[in-house]
Amino acid sequence: MARISGVDIPREKRVEIALTYIYGVGLTRSQKILASTGVSPDTRVKDLSDADVQKLRAAAETFTLEGDLRRQEGMAMKRLQDIGCLRGRRHRMGLPVRGQRTRTNARTRRGARKTVAGKKK
């Protein structure tokens, strides 16, 4: 397995898809990395030469990826919470941040339903 940005990318997949296993690299960024290095997107990871892997590693390091990106996102959320703005409070309460409705839906953000006992007759 080739190791890029601290992630073992799968050997059997095409390079274009394998790069998306790195946190912060989607299909578009993967294509940009491949275009800048001149590696064919259709090549399998197992067929890459060591020089190609080094080129990919160098190109990937120009972006904020993996742990640094997670830390950056966490710090941005913490900053919002510290200044006490609405977005920060919504993050803290585990509710949708961008104005979505919560009377119905929002199950992903709020978690599973907490069942309340019905009224006895």
Swiss-Prot record:
UniProt GO MF annotations: rRNA binding; structural constituent of ribosome; tRNA binding
UniProt feature, compositional bias: Basic residues: 100-121
Keyword Secreted recorded: no
GO biological process: translation
Claim: tRNA-binding is one of the keywords in the record: yes
Pfam families reported in the protein's UniProt record: Ribosomal_S13 (PF00416)
GO cellular component: cytosol; small ribosomal subunit
Region (Disordered): 99-121
Keywords: Ribonucleoprotein, Ribosomal protein, RNA-binding, rRNA-binding, tRNA-binding
Disulphide-bonded residues: none
Subunit structure: Part of the 30S ribosomal subunit. Forms a loose heterodimer with protein S19. Forms two bridges to the 50S subunit in the 70S ribosome.
Entries under PANTHER family matching the protein: 30S RIBOSOMAL PROTEIN S13/40S RIBOSOMAL PROTEIN S18, SMALL RIBOSOMAL SUBUNIT PROTEIN US13M
Family: Belongs to the universal ribosomal protein uS13 family.
Function recorded in the entry: Located at the top of the head of the 30S subunit, it contacts several helices of the 16S rRNA. In the 70S ribosome it contacts the 23S rRNA (bridge B1a) and protein L5 of the 50S subunit (bridge B1b), connecting the 2 subunits; these bridges are implicated in subunit movement. Contacts the tRNAs in the A and P-sites.
UniProt-recorded name of the protein: Small ribosomal subunit protein uS13
Gene: rpsM
